[in-house]
Amino acid sequence: MVETGLDAYRFSISWSRLIPNGRGPINLKGLQYYNSLINELISNGIQPHVTLHNYDLPQALEDEYGGWISRDVIEDFTNYADACFREFGDRVLYWTTVNEPNVFALGGYNQGSTPPRRCSPPFCITNGTRGNSTYEPYLAVHHILLAHSSAARLYRIKYRDNQHGYVGISVFTFGRLPQTNTEKDRVANERVHDFFIGWIMEPLVHGDYPISMKTNAGTRMPTFTIRESKLVKGSHDFIGVIHYNNVNVTDNSDTLNRKLRDFNADMAAMIIYNQDLFSDEEFPVAPWGLQEELDSFKLLYGNPPIFIYENGQRTASNSSLQDVSRVKYLHGYIGGVLNALRNGSNVRGYFAWSFLDVLELLDGYRSSYGLYYVDQDDPELKRYPKLSAKWYSRFLRGRSTSIVGDIGLEEDSSLVSVSHLFQ
């Protein structure tokens, strides 16, 4: 990290590693591990950005009350956050409570494709045996928002005066275009925004869910009490943005006629992906999507401080270290961030996904996003820098990035160096 020039690093704490049963005593070995990691980062001038929940809930709580579908999780999560603030908050300034709760809820409670793999037929894309896709995604996000606001309130009351840190939440985004220029597709495109982004952001900014969601989901949509609405509203100090690619949207309002509906049917729109999410196919370099999402946060949600926490190119795991497509992707998207900044977006930082090749949630080791290749056959798991690592290092150090190796790029991305803009 030091050789690359990183001045910040984002990682998640495993709740079950720190507090194995979800509540009760802290695992001292887990505590030592995270203290060592944080101390090593700080000693090398690297600022830690810590996520408290990333698809990882203690199994004991899942078994006891169903995890995020129970209100009991709010108190347990708040106590877990309290332990993290207490133990690490003297060195950690940026806390993300939950990573991408919108797609976490869809994969985990609607389609059954990601942990905890809850769903109900006919909406499962796996062999689901438990859950209810018609309302559990809404319930899980509802409890996540309440847990987030509870942890944020605790931090502001108990820790902020001494630690001077910030608490936020991250949201998965994608650029969207109507499939056709018809009014139906244009309206459907806005409805997709409500269901994916507004689902999280509207409660945080306005204290309630989007009207389109409440209308289409009806009584299956949870409601906030007056007190809860006030607690959730304004409970974020920043927003983490997760962004990889863009989609097309077409109207699918016929689904509203079904008696049995899930999130996708309530959304009444079809999302057309340009790539298979479960493949190693590369993403097109189309940074307009990220730029438009950043503009929408500015226009619709009060221009909150934003950290782009994930943005990167997917390649096959056995591809060359000369990852030209990743260099072009990062160059293009960082340029899109620059355009958003020029338009007044409140972007505070950018994190490329990912520093190393890691086990990916959807496709394991079949694909890679890392700047560094990890040799899984080496007992020491030796790291090798890819071309993108060299390019990114030059960018971070404010050096010319218009030519790396034999690649010629249209603009010099050193003009958007973190040291110049992300203060």
Where are these regions (language model features)?
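N-terminal carbohydrate-binding accessory modules
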Residues: 2-6
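Short, well-structured secondary-structure segments
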Residues: 7-14, 47-51
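Glycine-rich, proline-tolerant flexible connector loops at the mouths of alpha/beta enzymes
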Residues: 13-26
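Active-site region of glycoside hydrolase catalytic domains
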Residues: 21-23, 31-423
